[in-house]
């Protein structure tokens, strides 16, 4: 199993992403509890990475709120399709993303595990204009 890139990021890697990507951070009681990074590309697609919610705050709606805000921002920026990779054998992750309108496009084992490419087409999946928080 190759190393998980999120665990080997350097300060410079994080700094570069903060400067070049859209980074959303959920804060509760002045403590960061969730975040996501979004790279908007010239071809009207985006790549979602480093999405996570603090373990003690999972299943509280924070992840759904982050994803809903990400959807609204992607539409505002003219994004037609968003992509992400995740481990395809973790049912809770796949279920979460399916619930947000993603589907599995393909899988590979290039990183030592079954990694799924998930896609969400905004033309096919409406984003409900509901309250974010």
Where are these regions (language model features)?
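Conserved GNAT-fold acetyl-CoA-binding loop/helix
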Residues: 1-16
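Hydrophobic beta-strand residues of extracellular immunoglobulin-like
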Residues: 22-25, 116
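Conserved beta-strand in the GNAT
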Residues: 25, 31-39, 47-52
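A conserved beta-turn-beta hairpin within the catalytic core of GNAT-like acetyltransferases
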Residues: 40-49, 58, 77-80, 110-114
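Conserved acetyl-CoA-binding loop-helix of GNAT-fold acetyltransferases
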Residues: 53, 59-72, 95-99
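Conserved GNAT acetyl-CoA-binding A-motif
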Residues: 67, 74-86
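Conserved beta-strand-loop-alpha-helix junction that forms the acyl-donor binding cleft
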Residues: 83-94, 109-115
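Terminal substrate-recognition subdomain of acyl/acetyltransferases
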Residues: 113-133
């Amino acid at each position: 199993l190759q190393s998980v890139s999120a665990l080997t990021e350097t300060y410079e890697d994080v700094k570069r992403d903060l400067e070049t990507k859209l980074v959303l951070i959920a804060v509760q009681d002045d403590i960061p509890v969730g975040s996501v990074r979004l790279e908007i590309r010239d071809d009207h697609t985006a790549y979602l990475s480093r999405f996570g919610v603090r373990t003690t705050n999972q299943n509280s709606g924070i992840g759904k709120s982050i994803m809903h805000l990400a959807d609204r921002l992607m539409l505002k920026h003219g994004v037609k399709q968003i992509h992400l990779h995740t481990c395809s054998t973790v049912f809770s992750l796949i279920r979460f993303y399916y619930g947000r309108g993603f589907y599995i496009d393909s899988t590979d084992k290039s990183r030592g595990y079954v990694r799924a490419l998930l896609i969400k087409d905004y033309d096919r999946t409406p984003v409900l204009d509901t309250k974010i928080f």
